[in-house]
Amino acid sequence: MNYSIRLFKIMGIPIELHITFILFLVVIIGLSIMNNSIFWAVLFILLFVSVVLHELGHSYVAKKYGVKIEKILLLPIGGVAMMDKIPKEGELRIGIAGPLVSFIIGIVLLIVSQFFDININGYPLLYTLSLLNLMLGGFNLIPAFPMDGGRILRAILSKKYGYLKSTKIAANIGKSLALIMLLFGLLSMNIILILVSLFVYFGAEQESRVVEVETIFKNIKAKDIMTPNPVYVTPDMSIEEFLDFMLKHKYFGYPVVENGKLVGCIGIGNIHKKEGTVRDYMEKPVVVSEDTDIKEILRKMANTDRVFVVEGGKLKGIISKTDILRAMSILELKEELKD
């Protein structure tokens, strides 16, 4: 289900509103009407125009490095430019671009507001918007993930400490900052601050884990981590025979092979009755090749416990989540011992 609405395109990039943004906008407009003041509704809309320009700053520079931009998504807590993986050599410039746009908007509006401003319900619109843009640029320069400053810090540190270690440093700063924000949010009962702290914490954690997995599993293919020559069952095996087979081999899931070809898979969760055969309960297997990379394997394993490695029509191996965790532990240790 799609939870966003497309508005228009700028530089070929779709601009979309998340449904929560629309609900939040309705609340802001409702409160403005109740208070007989449209200032906050107008300010809110103009602020998110500024957020779009901020994200377009990132996107413009990213496109210069050949990065594909899927869309810019507007959320109540800000905007997100959804793009392909940023090349390491362009991360510094791409990270700076957004805050730079915000600072330029803020400074220009601040200068203009000294000579001309729009007063709504006694509030200076341009002056207030200029300060919010300066705050937006400054907040994003905080050297912690998932803010732009975290990416800028990583780009600078990676020249000395390497990409993975620099990511962990920036992520740890981000999580520490988030815990401080959460503490202040709880003490002051500030819901917005609590939500922002959670966003920062989990954003930093996710960035760290993604980079860690990509670094550790770099150049690792399915054939490197699979369990080769797995035991298998046949489709005509009775359920009673299958349960005895499971008890003997101690795995929860098995490939189903017929005439030398993989035709299905079956696990303990597929069995509901003792009657019938394996053919009656088996599922369609999720298949990869020997040269499938870890990123694609993890994507395919999002909704299954195991994938089957097939080459030339023949079953070569099986990769379970246990295999992934085992390989990760070993590769993490190898990475640590390098240091």
UniProtKB/Swiss-Prot annotation:
Keywords: CBS domain, Cell membrane, Hydrolase, Membrane, Metal-binding, Metalloprotease, Protease, Repeat, Transmembrane, Transmembrane helix, Zinc. SUPFAM superfamilies: CBS-domain pair. One of its GO terms (cellular component) is plasma membrane. Residues 226-281, 281-335 form the CBS domain. It is found in: Cell membrane. Its main location: membrane. Zn(2+) binds at H54, H58, D148. Binds 1 zinc ion per subunit. The chain crosses the membrane at residues 10-30, 33-53, 96-116, 125-145, 180-200, 251-271. Disulfide bonds: none annotated. It is an enzyme of class 3 (hydrolase). GO terms for molecular function: metal ion binding; metallopeptidase activity. Inhibited by 1,10-phenanthroline. Belongs to the peptidase M50B family. A site-2 regulated intramembrane protease (S2P) that cleaves type-2 transmembrane proteins within their membrane-spanning domains; its endogenous substrate is unknown. Regulated intramembrane proteolysis (RIP) occurs when an extracytoplasmic signal triggers a concerted proteolytic cascade to transmit information and elicit cellular responses. This is Zinc metalloprotease MJ0392. It comes from Methanocaldococcus jannaschii (strain ATCC 43067 / DSM 2661 / JAL-1 / JCM 10045 / NBRC 100440).
